Structure formats: C-alpha cells, structure tokens
C-alpha cells in the first residue's frame, strides 16, 4: 500500500468514528444545522441529570455508569460537531453555537485539536467510571472507548507519528488493549481492538518503549489473527503496510 493510499485509509477509519454523527444529523435536524433546539435542550438536560447521579451518593456502580453515559453523550455531540467541520470547514447554526458556548462554560469544556482542527474526546468521564468501578459491568466499555478515542485523536495523518504521546500513555494503552482482547462483548469491536493494539506495538517498536522482539512478535500474532478472521479488512492492509520493512 502506497503512503498516499495509507493516509487515505486512515482518514477513512477516523471518519468512520463520525458516522453515527452523520446519521444523527441527517435524521434529526435541519439541513444546515448539526444540532436543533430540541437536541440542544435534550443534550444539556441529559448531561445535567447524569452529573447529579455521578456526583451524588448512589452506589459506585451507578455513579460509574453515569460517568460512562456522560462520556458517550459528549462523544455523540463531538461527532456531530466534527462532521459539520469536515463537511463545511466549521460548525454552523445558532443552536450549535449556543450548545458549544454552554458546554465551554461548564465542566464539559470542549477541546479543539490545533493539528486536526477537530474536537477531541474528553477522557475524564471514562477514567472516572473506571476509578469508581474498575471491575464492574460498564468497565470494559469505558476502557474500550477510552482506548479507541485516544488512538484516533493521537495523530494527524500517520499513526506512527503520534502527537505528544508519552511512553507512560503508550504503555497504558497497550495494557488496555491486551485486557480487551479476550473479551466477548457486543459493545466492543474486536477488530478495532486488534488493529489499534497492533499500531501501538508498532509505536512501541519505533520509540523503543518495549523490547523489539516482543513488539515484533505481537504484531505478527495480530496480523495472523486478521488474516484468519478479517482477511479483506482495510485495517489488515494498513497493518501490513506499516509493519513491512
């Protein structure tokens, strides 16, 4: 796979994370507004109710789930905003502007990547969920979403050139990926986990964050898994291109 094709493939995968936002915008709002008045009110009301639960006196599992749902809600909003930016170069519409301003005035301040000019996922809700109930039934999904969004927010065009990713952060993400691999959960995309974990091992190889032999062995195992389970996957082609000498 040529570099130009690889870059296109990675942008396609990143855009795939925004597909839900595109569907929501097509189905539920006016032609030029990513977010309607009703959607804005519903989002803010939901975030307010979730905050009351997350910061209340409910059992840890219930508060953890509220944090998880907060993260999912914020990422749903983020997908809509980013789809607007991708389509029009900026967010559009009065209600969208009102929602962005209200979020920025709250604890849910939005952060725009200076490199991609897209809104970044907020890891805090997922980390709060894991801190409250690390072995609960919502923990695996929180870990997966943190793992997934960290990856797609971490680079511009080339995943082996991450933006300011520390060794500690890389090793944490590898640990998350290894923890997620054996799980069978409808909310966790196994192909995505294998792909991102493979890329992280290639990053660890490039940065010498882990022994060379270990990184090469794990990448080979992941590629072998792809060839047997997802042989026509674009992710397999990307892994093969990135791992070739």
How would you name each of these model-derived features?
Residues 3-17:
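Bacterial N-terminal signal peptides that target proteins for export
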Residues 1, 28-31:
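Intrinsically disordered, low-complexity peptide-like regions
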Residues 16-26:
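Bacterial N-terminal signal peptides
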Residues 30-245:
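Acidic, polar-rich low-complexity tracts and alpha-helical solenoid repeat scaffolds
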């Amino acid at each position: 796979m040529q570099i130009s094709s690889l870059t296109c493939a990675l942008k396609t995968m990143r855009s795939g994370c925004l597909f839900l936002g595109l569907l929501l915008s097509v189905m539920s709002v006016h032609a030029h507004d990513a977010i309607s008045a009703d959607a804005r009110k519903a989002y803010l009301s939901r975030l307010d109710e979730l905050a009351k639960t997350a910061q209340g006196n409910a059992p840890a599992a219930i508060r953890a789930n509220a944090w998880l749902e907060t993260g999912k809600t914020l990422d749903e909003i983020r997908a809509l905003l980013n789809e607007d930016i991708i389509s029009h170069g900026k967010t559009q519409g009065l209600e969208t502007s009102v929602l962005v301003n209200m979020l920025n005035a709250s604890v849910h301040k939005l952060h725009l990547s200076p490199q991609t000019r897209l809104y970044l996922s907020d890891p805090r809700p997922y980390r709060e969920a894991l801190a409250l109930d690390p072995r609960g039934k919502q923990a695996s999904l929180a870990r997966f979403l943190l793992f997934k969004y960290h990856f797609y927010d971490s680079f511009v065009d080339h995943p082996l050139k991450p933006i300011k990713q520390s060794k500690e952060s890389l090793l944490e993400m590898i640990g998350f990926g290894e923890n997620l691999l054996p799980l069978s959960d409808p909310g966790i995309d196994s192909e995505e986990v294998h792909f991102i974990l493979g890329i992280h091992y290639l990053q660890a190889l490039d940065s010498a964050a882990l022994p060379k032999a270990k990184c090469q062995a794990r990448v080979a195992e992941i590629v072998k898994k792809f060839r047997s389970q997802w042989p026509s996957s674009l992710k397999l082609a990307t892994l093969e291109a990135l791992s070739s000498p």
